[in-house]
Amino acid sequence: MRGDTGAIVGVCISHERASVDQLETAAADSERHAVESLLANPAVEEAIALQTCNRTEGYVVVSDHEDGLEALELFTRAVPDDVVVEMGHEESLRHLLRVAAGLESIVLGEDQILGQLRTAYETARGVGGIGPMLEDGVTKAIHVGERARTETKINEGVVSIASAAVRLLKQESSLTDGTALVVGAGEMGQLAAEALSEEVDRLLVANRTVPHAEHIAESVDIDASALALDGIEAAVSEASAVISATGSGDQVFDIGTFSDSGDVSIVDIAQPRDVPAGADRLPSVTVYDLDALESVTAETRNKRQRAAEAVERIVDEEFDRLLTQYKRKRADRVISTMYESAEQVKAAEINSALSAADFDDEQAEVVEAMADAIVSQILAAPTKSLRDAAEEDDWSTIHTALQLFDPDFGGPDQATPPEFTKGMSVEDIPDGMRDEIPNAMLDRLSDD
């Protein structure tokens, strides 16, 4: 039963352990491509990828943990083992909740990660990556992110990587001549433009799609102009500060871009990076990357620590609820399967009995009522055992029950136990269930 016994396996490569180069290496071409590649693996039932400027994460639902890690080598194979965090089912769920709440971000509590997770969810759902397991996990994470920001002050102050970049430029006195350039017109570019508009007199916005750049230029309350990417070299010569935040797969700048520039400071928060590695060796160019933002975000982190403690409590509370929800759903699915199997056997035996003798309607009702009572009594103890097993995380018992009570088991056309029971002995059945299973079924397993 696809999805009924699977569990989540996840990997995370983030700014906590990985360099900017390693983050760039780990990232797939796109979240969509990553999910499609993961789903191409026959062991993977569900999949989602989350790629931002400071993290690359992948999650799959599989029946075997090692199969999951093998599939997730899509992200991990080209980076050192010590920058990869491997996560099992519960670790993955808790981590997702923490990510959505902003507890794992460079800027503690920043808002953008919640939108990025929503986008990753919609992307994965669009290509068939979201099933019941990830549906519950990711939507719960989004709910936690919303609670964190409405019930605490986790996102007060510097609230984005873009605003942290502006603060860094201000600290380094790079905003003194009044002109700044933003490259990229996505959400991060919009935030950078808004933050810069409070510090400079003139803003240039460059983007591959000029109308998008025009939209940002029109949204700020200072002198602002939009331009295409082929006008970047001229724009750099006018600006003393640049924030680059495109989602381009190609580098936007080259060394020649800075040939006519004066002193310019660039914060490159794109993933992959927009600025070539050798640019910071030019005497007039200073390049800052995500690592440089740590000094700016440390102050914000300290201010938000009390709020973070409240968010941790929200995460703990919602995590416990999520686990209970998973356990209840999985136990209910197995119990439903068990009852379906019993109903098939009951219906077949009633039909056989009623056709073999001349029962009137009242007698037939008595036979059917007796059969219902027998099924209920037989399954009462296994039902309790399954619910107890779910509460105690005893998934081996639940998996055995799924095999034993497969809907095809005991069907009228089946004279022998189905294929899945080959190699299974009576001793493999949990004690609480074995005592309640009809001897005929046990004999068929023993004979096989």
Curated annotation (Swiss-Prot):
Protein's pathway: Porphyrin-containing compound metabolism; protoporphyrin-IX biosynthesis; 5-aminolevulinate from L-glutamyl-tRNA(Glu): step 1/2
**CDD domains found in the cross-reference section:** NAD_bind_Glutamyl_tRNA_reduct
Give the EC number(s) under which this enzyme is classified: 1.2.1.70
Q: Which UniProt keywords apply?
A: NADP, Oxidoreductase, Porphyrin biosynthesis
Q: What class of enzyme is it?
A: oxidoreductase
Q: Which GO terms describe its biological process?
A: protoporphyrinogen IX biosynthetic process from glutamate
Positions annotated to bind NADP(+): 184-189
- List all disulphide bridges recorded for this chain: none
Cite the NCBIfam families for this sequence: hemA
What assembly does the database describe for this protein? Homodimer.
This chain's protein is named: Glutamyl-tRNA reductase
Q: Which organism is it from?
A: Haloarcula marismortui (strain ATCC 43049 / DSM 3752 / JCM 8966 / VKM B-1809) (Halobacterium marismortui)
